[in-house]
Amino acid sequence: MAINTDTSGKQKALTMVLNQIERSFGKGAIMRLGDATRMRVETISSGALTLDLALGGGLPKGRVIEIYGPESSGKTTVALHALAEVQRNGGIAAFVDAEHALDPTYAAALGVDIDNLLISQPDTGESALEIVDQLVRSAAVDIVVIDSVAALVPRAEIEGDMGDAHVGLQARLMSQALRKITGNIGKSGCTVIFINQLRQKIGVTYGSPETTTGGNALKFYASVRLDIRRIQTLKKGTDEYGNRVKVKVAKNKVAPPFRIAEFDIIFGKGISTLGCVVDLAEETGIIIRKGAWYSYNGDNISQGRDNAIKYLEEKPEFAEEIKKLVREKLDKGAVVSANSVAKASEEDEEEEVDLEPEE
């Protein structure tokens, strides 16, 4: 069979078929990758500079994100910080409160504009996911948070009796909904964050017995999966004032996965952004720690990490200078714990494999 070497003829045929596809399916249905308007993935700050580094810049826009972990580990806090960041940049944010547990006072303390926040408290999982799909398709909303997947109860389960068995109903619901939602997300550029809970698998003798609710569909469709854990309780004397948390990027389709970030969450205030700055300034050598003392340019600024954070709070101009120096070092390729890839465990590697979602 002769190979067609007529380049101009091929180009003419290609132009004709591209025009025909665009007439049939709309402009933008097919394009050269170099012509795409969104070659670089835009990001939303998570509120923690260390987590932004671990994510390769922040939470990606126009993607499905899953945040999961044990109770009171900071899942909703990270999601609320993302909402606040979008609102600060003039975007519209929505919160689907399936758990009926949103605290407006805490959200406001984290910087969320609660007066302009769209909130829905649906009764069934079908209603919640249909609302999410309509918000995404509108292309008017920039970010939607669903709290949580475990609370998306199928209508049949709500209307049935207490002891009825409903095997796989929620997994099928999530699979059907995500097939619709992901296609619309790509067109609208809306970020959808699912908060999820952990459950224990019964009879597991090898590997981690932990699993997330809602089946495998969300694992498959999510571009980013964040595993957040509380690793330390922060105390002043006997009074607890916050938690130290560790976030593992269990899956990332837009940057290297398996990075780990640590930061503080202060009760009533949210993520300690200046705590992240102090940690990164120390790792990059901008602030030097000798024993308990922290120094900058040879001058002692505080004794102890908490006092170093307090010093930056009291001197915002100095804090901005340190932030700028940290970012410059990181832009030049400085390697810190948050942007170095941690060794993946066997459980991580199993999690990264994309399984076909169950029907």
Curated annotation (Swiss-Prot):
Molecular functions (GO terms): ATP binding; ATP hydrolysis activity; ATP-dependent DNA damage sensor activity; damaged DNA binding; single-stranded DNA binding
UniProt-listed PROSITE patterns: RECA_1, RECA_2, RECA_3
Keyword Metal-binding in record: no
GO cellular component term, pick one: cytosol
UniProt-annotated location(s): Cytoplasm
GO biological process: DNA recombination; DNA repair; SOS response
Compositional bias segments (type: Acidic residues): 346-359
InterPro entries: AAA+_ATPase, DNA_recomb/repair_RecA, DNA_recomb/repair_RecA_CS, P-loop_NTPase, RecA-like_C, RecA-like_N, RecA_ATP-bd, RecA_C_sf
Tagged with keyword Nucleotide-binding: yes
Residues at which ATP binds: G69, P70, E71, S72, S73, G74, K75, T76
UniProt KW keywords: ATP-binding, Cytoplasm, DNA damage, DNA recombination, DNA repair, DNA-binding, Nucleotide-binding, SOS response
Region span, Disordered: 337-359
Gene3D superfamilies in UniProt: P-loop containing nucleotide triphosphate hydrolases (3.40.50.300)
Family annotation (SUPFAM superfamilies): P-loop containing nucleoside triphosphate hydrolases, RecA protein, C-terminal domain
Superkingdom as given in the UniProt entry: Bacteria
NCBIfam families cross-referenced by the UniProt entry: tigrfam_recA
Function, as annotated: Can catalyze the hydrolysis of ATP in the presence of single-stranded DNA, the ATP-dependent uptake of single-stranded DNA by duplex DNA, and the ATP-dependent hybridization of homologous single-stranded DNAs. It interacts with LexA causing its activation and leading to its autocatalytic cleavage.
Homology family: Belongs to the RecA family.
Protein name per the record: Protein RecA
Species name: Nostoc punctiforme (strain ATCC 29133 / PCC 73102)
